[in-house]
């Protein structure tokens, strides 16, 4: 008889490392029981039909089992399949068990349970196969969804049952109980209740006929709950833009199928050997009702391209890594001369000799030996409607010149049907003219000849008058050297435009001819009812626009005094104020705002075609000087841009610019609770982006932590307190179809109801708000706490939420940075400020990822101290600072900090490393107490940003 050695079965997914009843620990190499037997060594279990990954819904206990079982991956209409496994290289009786495990590596026990024809009370399914057919098909499997409220107890029970089964005991030791408690806590953090996998384990009979010989288990593909937003396939439906600048920052509206706002990103990539990829910039608040994303394009990896470059973009889930089909996106080269000023300046300048031949006007000169006026003329586009400069002239040869540039042939060629009061001359072929003359009687011919002679006399008189005036102007110019003498005669020609639509005044501004500008303006103003001063070229630019673009301050002032209209917009909807701010020219902005016509509120708050007013552009350009000038001139610091209703403070928070946000709040008194069209305050944006520094500053300056946006969350528990938990499960699950705006699936909805109902009710009591059944709005909106995924931000918000356990009145703030002694900070500052390049405070700022503050503090008396205060405000600690100094090679600084009393007090070998705020990711999971700062460290973190701009004492949240 063959001897079979059995290693006792042990479940590796529940109790790794727990000792057996004999006191011997299980080696990790023996976690999967092995059957040692010559005939059984080659036996194995395999999945021949995977379960369908998407489209199957998990159900709650109260709903009963599903009407249809979990289908197979290849199942289709008319051909149903189900999950199927088979034992190979073995013939005989066997038992196959199926249970649920997590979608982690390695898989671990899952809280959900299986139901079906062969299921038991423990949530497993067991079937017996053999000896003829070793295939097991599971055609009636259902998955029971548990709530987070019951998740802990179910996991404990499953783990206890596995240990008792594997050890053969009836009770657990205290050590085992504690290990289970800790493992359940860890398991809850990584378990996704919307994803499960099937674990199939085959048991073969031993010598006693008991099914104890286990083959290595096999794990199925992940199965997604169809009610979860993460279960749907990613798909891009539409984009409003498929090309953008190589420098990035273009706003794109993308429509898609249902996504989760905190588990989605837009990835740009190149499918080549370089492997470049980047991600679109957006916050959870930029995801609209799970079906639209508004993001800004990332910059291309190189700015120097001479032709358009096509890349790909796709939607990607952060957790599972699922991606959508790729779409093409084109980066076009950077526009170096968007206003085309440099292109026009590079044109060949005219010379004196250009006007000897083929002059562009009757007085432009003629070739030697030719009569006056027979030189080739150009068609002049007279757009000025008030002009009346048409004239005729004759020559000895009988020809003449019309103001439109056409030559007259014979006066007798006039059309006999002409009935206009003002005579005109038509051009005909000579054959047609001869025929017309021969058919006209002598009386008509005499009349026409007289009429023609009269026209010629009038033309000669006009030409003579113009010649006399030009001659006198030339003599006067020779006497006075004043070019206006010559310009006055041809003042109506100042409306002439070239191929770009530029008038002489445009060209004078482009080429910086200040004296010519002055002379032209004076001549133009002498024309009654003229509009030449405000004429636009083909780019919709007036001379005033060009003066601002080319930064000619005196010219801009002169044009405004002359009556130039500052309200005219260019092709992008930019006023002169927009242009000055976009070029970061605060001096030009000051010149413009001195004139009442520019400082009018309707102009100073006028948006461009993108909906942005000058104050919004000042924030986007990070220019505090322009911002101050505009606000002092009457600009609305809380002005809402037209696309989404963001105020300048919203934009500063969106840019993660702490310095500018503090400046807006403390210096310019921006509304800290201003709302966008979607009801989001700046605090919503800061929290959703996971920024502890901005969040702390806003709440300390009075931001309303309890403010709700307009996006509904899961509804509150029913007013009927007698409603059972299972009933609420059904109600929440079925009602989720009616408020699909929420990003949570049905399980999350139930979990929120079970776990957070008391907290939500308490929050509403603090705001004197009744539950939704007594409110006009059926569902409550998201608060900043609801939007954040950062534990640090959540801690900051909870400290400033009235009524919360961690909330307390604001006390005195610590004076010392990182609780270090004053002399230690001073010595460290001296060491860094006197350090060489690469080992100074700017290098420290770069390594701490706070390089954006270098410009802010470089001219202050204590830049190092200011930098360290911001580092502390971001959640940094002393240990990380020491590690950073060590990486910079500043051993003296490391030694200085290690000798400090603060380091000696708090340092211990077992101290866990804290992750600083600027290293935190937006998707960080809830951290256990072992990963957070201890109480002594928390007390050293300041709760205010007052050190940044110490003017007034900040107020606590409402």
UniProtKB/Swiss-Prot annotation:
Residues 350-374, 411-442, 705-766, 904-958 are annotated as: Disordered. The keyword Signal does not apply. A motif (Nuclear localization signal) lies at residues 343-347. Residues 815-901 form the Death domain. Its main location: nucleus. While translation occurs, the particular unfolded structure after the GRR repeat promotes the generation of p52 making it an acceptable substrate for the proteasome. This process is known as cotranslational processing. The processed form is active and the unprocessed form acts as an inhibitor (I kappa B-like), being able to form cytosolic complexes with NF-kappa B, trapping it in the cytoplasm. Complete folding of the region downstream of the GRR repeat precludes processing. It is found in: Nucleus; Cytoplasm. Residues 352-390 are annotated as: GRR. InterPro entries: Ankyrin_rpt (IPR002110), Ankyrin_rpt-contain_sf (IPR036770), DEATH-like_dom_sf (IPR011029), Death_dom (IPR000488), Ig-like_fold (IPR013783), Ig_E-set (IPR014756), IPT_dom (IPR002909), IPT_NFkappaB (IPR033926). It holds the Pfam family RHD_DNA_bind. SUPFAM superfamilies: Ankyrin repeat, DEATH domain, E set domains, p53-like transcription factors. Residues 412-425, 917-931 have a biased composition (Polar residues). ANK repeats lie at residues 500-529, 539-568, 572-603, 610-639, 644-674, 678-707. Residues 753-766, 904-916 have a biased composition (Basic and acidic residues). The record marks 467-468 as: Cleavage (when cotranslationally processed). GO terms for cellular component: cytoplasm; nucleus. Residues 357-374 have a biased composition (Gly residues). Keywords: Activator, ANK repeat, Biological rhythms, Cytoplasm, DNA-binding, Nucleus, Repeat, Repressor, Transcription, Transcription regulation. GO terms for molecular function: DNA-binding transcription factor activity, RNA polymerase II-specific; RNA polymerase II cis-regulatory region sequence-specific DNA binding. Residues 40-230 form the RHD domain. Active NF-kappa-B is a heterodimer of an about 52 kDa DNA-binding subunit and the weak DNA-binding subunit p65. Two heterodimers might form a labile tetramer. Appears to have dual functions such as cytoplasmic retention of attached NF-kappa-B proteins and generation of p52 by a cotranslational processing. The proteasome-mediated process ensures the production of both p52 and p100 and preserves their independent function. p52 binds to the kappa-B consensus sequence 5'-GGRNNYYCC-3', located in the enhancer region of genes involved in immune response and acute phase reactions. In concert with RELB, may play a role in the regulation of the circadian clock. The C-terminus of p100 might be involved in cytoplasmic retention, inhibition of DNA-binding by p52 homodimers, and/or transcription activation. This is Nuclear factor NF-kappa-B p100 subunit.
């Amino acid at each position: 008889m063959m001897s079979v050695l059995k290693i006792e079965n042990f479940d590796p997914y529940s109790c790794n490392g727990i000792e057996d009843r004999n006191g011997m620990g299980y080696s990790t190499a023996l976690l999967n029981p092995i059957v040692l037997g010559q005939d059984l060594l080659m036996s194995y279990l395999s999945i021949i039909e995977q379960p369908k990954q998407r489209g199957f819904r998990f159900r709650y206990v109260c709903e009963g089992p599903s009407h249809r079982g979990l289908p197979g991956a290849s199942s289709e209409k008319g051909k149903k399949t189900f999950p199927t496994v088979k034992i190979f290289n073995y013939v005989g009786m066997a038992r196959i068990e199926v249970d649920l495990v997590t979608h982690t590596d390695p898989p671990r026990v899952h809280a959900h349970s299986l139901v079906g024809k062969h299921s038991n009370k423990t949530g497993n399914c067991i079937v017996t196969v053999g000896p003829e057919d070793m295939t097991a098909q599971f055609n009636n499997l259902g998955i029971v969804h548990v709530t987070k409220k019951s998740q802990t107890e179910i996991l404990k029970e499953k783990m206890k049952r596995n240990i008792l089964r594997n050890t053969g005991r009836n009770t657990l030791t205290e050590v085992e109980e504690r290990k289970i408690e800790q493992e359940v806590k860890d398991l809850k953090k990584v378990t996704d209740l919307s994803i499960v996998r099937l674990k199939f384990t085959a048991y073969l009979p031993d010598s006693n006929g008991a099914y104890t010989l286990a083959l290595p288990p096999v794990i199925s593909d992940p199965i997604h709950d169809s009610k979860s937003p993460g279960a749907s396939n990613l798909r891009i439906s539409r984009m409003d833009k498929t090309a953008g600048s190589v420098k990035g920052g273009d706003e794109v509206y993308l429509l898609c199928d249902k996504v989760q706002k905190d588990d989605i990103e837009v990835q740009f990539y190149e499918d080549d050997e370089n492997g470049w990829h980047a991600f679109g910039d957006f916050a959870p608040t930029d995801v609209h009702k799970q079906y639209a994303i508004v993001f800004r394009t990332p910059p291309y990896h190189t700015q120097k391209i001479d032709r358009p470059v096509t890349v790909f973009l796709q939607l990607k889930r952060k957790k599972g890594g699922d991606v959508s089909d790729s779409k093409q996106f084109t980066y076009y080269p950077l526009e170096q001369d968007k206003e085309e000023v440099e292109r026009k300046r590079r044109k060949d300048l005219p010379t004196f000799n250009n006007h000897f031949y083929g002059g562009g006007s009757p007085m432009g000169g003629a070739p030697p030996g030719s009569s006056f006026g027979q030189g080739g003329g150009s068609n002049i586009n007279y757009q000025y409607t008030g002009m009346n400069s048409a004239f005729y002239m004759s020559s000895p040869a009988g020809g003449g010149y019309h103001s439109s540039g056409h030559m007259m042939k014979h006066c007798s060629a006039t059309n006999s049907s002409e009935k206009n009061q003002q005579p005109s001359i038509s051009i005909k072929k000579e054959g047609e003219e001869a025929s017309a003359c021969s058919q006209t009687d002598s009386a008509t011919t005499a009349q026409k000849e007289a009429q023609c002679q009269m026209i010629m006399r009038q033309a000669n008189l006009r030409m003579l008058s113009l010649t006399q005036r030009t001659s006198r102007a030339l003599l006067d110019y020779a006497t006075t050297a004043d070019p206006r003498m010559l310009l006055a005669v041809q003042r109506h020609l100042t409306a002439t435009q070239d191929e770009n639509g530029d008038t002489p005044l445009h060209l004078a501004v482009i080429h910086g001819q200040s004296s010519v500008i002055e002379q032209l303006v004076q001549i133009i103003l002498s024309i009654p009812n003229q509009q030449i001063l405000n004429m636009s070229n083909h780019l919709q630019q007036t001379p005033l626009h060009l003066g601002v673009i080319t930064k000619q301050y005196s010219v801009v002032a002169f044009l405004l005094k002359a009556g130039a209209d500052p309200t005219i917009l260019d092709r992008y909807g930019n006023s002169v104020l927009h242009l000055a701010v976009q070029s970061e020219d605060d001096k030009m902005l000051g010149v413009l705002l001195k004139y009442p016509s520019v400082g009018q509120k309707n102009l100073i708050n006028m948006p461009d075609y993108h909906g942005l007013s000058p104050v919004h552009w000042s924030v986007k350009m990070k220019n505090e000087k322009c911002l101050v000038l505009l606000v002092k001139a009457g600009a609305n610091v809380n002005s809402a841009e037209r696309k989404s209703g963001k105020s300048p403070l919203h934009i500063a928070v969106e840019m993660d610019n702490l310095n500018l946000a503090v400046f807006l709040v403390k210096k310019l008194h921006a509304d800290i609770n201003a709302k966008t069209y979607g009801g989001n305050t700046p605090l919503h944006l800061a929290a959703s982006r996971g920024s502890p520094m901005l969040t702390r500053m806003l709440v300390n300056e009075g931001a309303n932590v309890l403010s709700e946006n307009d996006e509904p969350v899961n509804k509150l528990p029913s007013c009927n307190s007698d409603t059972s938990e299972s009933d609420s499960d059904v109600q929440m699950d079925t009602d989720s179809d009616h408020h699909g705006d929420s990003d949570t699936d049905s399980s999350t909805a139930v979990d929120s109801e079970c776990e957070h109902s008391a907290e939500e009710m308490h929050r509403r009591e603090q705001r004197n708000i009744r539950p939704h059944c007594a409110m006009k709005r059926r569902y409550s909106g998201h608060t900043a706490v609801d939007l954040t995924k950062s534990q640090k931000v959540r801690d900051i918000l909870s400290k400033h939420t009235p009524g919360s356990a961690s909330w307390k009145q604001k006390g005195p703030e610590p004076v010392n940075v990182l609780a270090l002694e004053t002399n230690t900070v001073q010595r460290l500052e001296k060491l860094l400020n006197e350090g060489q390049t690469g080992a100074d405070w700017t290098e420290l700022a770069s390594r701490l990822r706070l390089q954006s503050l270098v410009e802010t503090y470089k001219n202050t008396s204590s830049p190092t101290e200011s930098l360290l205060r911001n580092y502390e405000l971001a959640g940094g600690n002393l240990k990380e600072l020491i590690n950073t100094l060590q990486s910079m090679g500043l051993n003296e600084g490391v030694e200085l900090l290690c000798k400090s009393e603060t380091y000696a007090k708090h340092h211990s070998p077992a101290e866990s490393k804290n992750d600083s705020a600027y290293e935190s990711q937006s998707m960080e999971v809830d951290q256990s107490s072992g990963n957070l700062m201890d109480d002594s460290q928390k007390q050293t973190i300041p709760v205010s940003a007052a050190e940044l701009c110490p003017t007034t004492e900040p107020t606590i949240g409402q």
